[in-house]
Structure formats: structure tokens, C-alpha cells
Amino acid sequence: MGKKAIQFGGGNIGRGFVAEFLHEAGYEVVFVDVMDKIIDALTSNPSYQVTEVSDEGERTKTITNYSAINSKTHESEVVQEIATADVVTCAVGPNILKFIAPVIAKGIDARTASKPLAVIACENAIGATDTLHGFIKQNTDESRLSTMGERAQFANSAIDRIVPNQPAGEGLNVRIEKFYEWVVEKTPFGSVGHPDIPAIHWVDHLEPYIERKLFTVNTGHATTAYYGYQRGKKMIAEALADPEIRQIVHQVLEETASLIVAKHEISEEEQKEYVNTIISRISNPYLEDNVERVGRAPLRKLSRKERFIGPAAQLAEKGMKYDALLGSVEMALRFQNVPGDEESVELAKILNEMSADDATAKLTGLEKSHPLYQPVQNVVAKVQKGGK
């Protein structure tokens, strides 16, 4: 029997990051999605191409040995596949984890294999696999919870690879940044051992990697997008070519760097090098990435553990500087009524209908007693008044 992986989410990250490396590791990949269009395309095409883009040029890989199932219409087939798989991964967005948990719970419960299933959520969120695990437990019979560890092991991961807007008419093919980082904690697998996926960097402690990535790549990328959007820039590379925006992004990342260095065993020099690499990556004009794609979903990006409030709250607790991050928060709050982005419409509604206090609590999840609450509330009030 060959190795088999179930990948929830047949979108660009699912096809162009996760499945690429599962395929290279020798896994048969079963895509699970609820979008008929994606399932039909995967079912009717025996291969697709992943093109890695860098300033050195392009490199194309062909992905084969996959199938696809619509979990909306063929749930029992998905359950059966999970029951006989080695690995389950997902790239569906943190808000969708609760919707995929019931079918994964059924699949885990149906397992009789001697080796536990490895479950790895590949989302831009801290502790995404823990979150998924929680939803799976809610969908599992209580009498089966104590033995779940025999059937499945859950490991958090940090993923980092930029997938820009795709050219029209490319179908399943994905253009993607050459650089990638996929870090997964190995401790949950214990004596059983982790799956054999060479692209993964297995570590004992994941938090430094997740925070470094989220508070550098995601914070920097989104800051560029929101400032760029306000200044009429179309592309991320174009925004970063503006010396003023580039300077602001550096200031924001100096603040998050001070947190990362203070908290984790990462030296100032190492973090500085990492920041420079990140800025050079997101400046890459070959990626042709636009500010609206990177800025979309501002409600999620403004939430408590995310890329702005997450580091700013920790800095405030430590009595450290977070002024530049407040600027990013302000620009994110101004990302309203953007065509095709429901969250930006909802954001405008919240800021229009709620008091500054209520809007701050709802958007950021900060408690009134938190040292960051009042500074953020001031920014919310300023945006509500239309001040620049």
C-alpha cells in the first residue's frame, strides 16, 4: 500500500504548497472541498503545474497522482479515505476549521489502522491544529475520546509561502513564490515518529517559529497592503517601492522584532536578517501580488491573536514601544467597502453603527483593563470621525 494524504481545501495554497510537497514525498493526495468547480477541475485533469517564481527565473513542476471528493455530496467516501489515510492536512482558512471537523471526526473514529493518523492544519493562525482538534473532540462520542490518541495525533504547524493572485485562465496551475517554510512540531508523535515529508522542518517547540513568521511576514505584508491601498498603489511591490511606505514597514517590523528577540531565543542579528529577507521577498515584482488580495479579511487580521493586536498587546504588557503597529491598525480600520471583500463591508458597518468602545471590543477582543485598549480605542474613534 502506498502512502496517502487527505488535503482539505483545493485552493491555491492546498494545490500549490501542501499538495506539491506531499506529492514530492511520495503520497497519493486526495483533495476534499465543497466547491463543485474545484472538484470538477481536479477530477477531469490528471495533472496540474506549480510554477515557482523568483528573481532567478521560473521553475515548473508537474503534480500527478491525486483525486478529489466533494464532502458536501460524498461525505461517506471522505470518511472512508480518512479511515485508511496516513496524513490529513488542511488549508481552508481558520474560520472554516469548525466545518471540516465533523467529517474528520467520523473518519478518525472509523480507523482501525495500527499507526495513528497525523493531522496537521496548515493555516495562518497560531495553534490552528489545536483549534481543529478541539472541534473534532466536540464531534466525537465521549466514550471514544480517551482512546482517540491511538487513532490520531495532532501537530501544530507554521507555514510561509506567498501565493499571489493568479493569472486568469490558468485553471488548476499555480504560480507561487520559490521561498517556503513549513515547520511542524514533532513532540505529539512521540515514539510512533512523525510522517516522512522531507519539505517539513520538524521542531520540538513551534511557538518561536509561528510568532516570528506571523509577526514578521504577515504583519509586514498586511502593513504594506493597507498603507499601499490608502495611497492608491495597486501592487505590493509598487507600494514597497515608495520610500515612505518602506520606512513605515521597517518601523513596524522593528517593533515586532523587539518582542521576538525579548521573548524567544532569537538574536537581534538573526531577526534583522530575517526581516530583510522578508522585505526583499514581498518586494518581489515577479510575484505580481496586489494590495487588495493581501489586505482582504480585515476583521480577521484585526482580531486578538492576529498580526497587529497580537504583538502590540504583548509589547504593551511589557511596557515596550508599539506606535508603528498602531499605525497599521489604523490603516486596517480604513480598509472599508472594498469590492469583493465581505469583511471590509462588515468593518464599515461596525464602525458606522457602534460606539468606539463597542467597536474596539468587538474588533480586537481586548479587555478594557488591557494597556493596549485605550490607545486602540483612540485610533478607532479617530477613524470613525474621519480624521486623517
Curated annotation (Swiss-Prot):
One of its GO terms (molecular function) is mannitol-1-phosphate 5-dehydrogenase activity. InterPro entries: 6-PGluconate_DH-like_C_sf, 6PGD_dom2, Mannitol_1_phos_5_DH, Mannitol_DH, Mannitol_DH_C, Mannitol_DH_N, NAD(P)-bd_dom_sf. Disulfide bonds: none annotated. This is Mannitol-1-phosphate 5-dehydrogenase. Keywords: NAD, Oxidoreductase. One of its GO terms (biological process) is mannitol catabolic process. NAD(+) binds at A5, I6, Q7, F8, G9, G10, G11, N12, I13, G14, R15, G16. It catalyses: D-mannitol 1-phosphate + NAD(+) = beta-D-fructose 6-phosphate + NADH + H(+). Its EC number is 1.1.1.17. It is an enzyme of class 1 (oxidoreductase). The active site is at K213. Belongs to the mannitol dehydrogenase family. Monomer. Catalyzes the NAD(H)-dependent interconversion of D-fructose 6-phosphate and D-mannitol 1-phosphate in the mannitol metabolic pathway. It holds the Pfam family Mannitol_dh. PANTHER family: ALTRONATE OXIDOREDUCTASE-RELATED, MANNITOL-1-PHOSPHATE 5-DEHYDROGENASE. It comes from Aspergillus clavatus (strain ATCC 1007 / CBS 513.65 / DSM 816 / NCTC 3887 / NRRL 1 / QM 1276 / 107). GO terms for cellular component: cytosol.
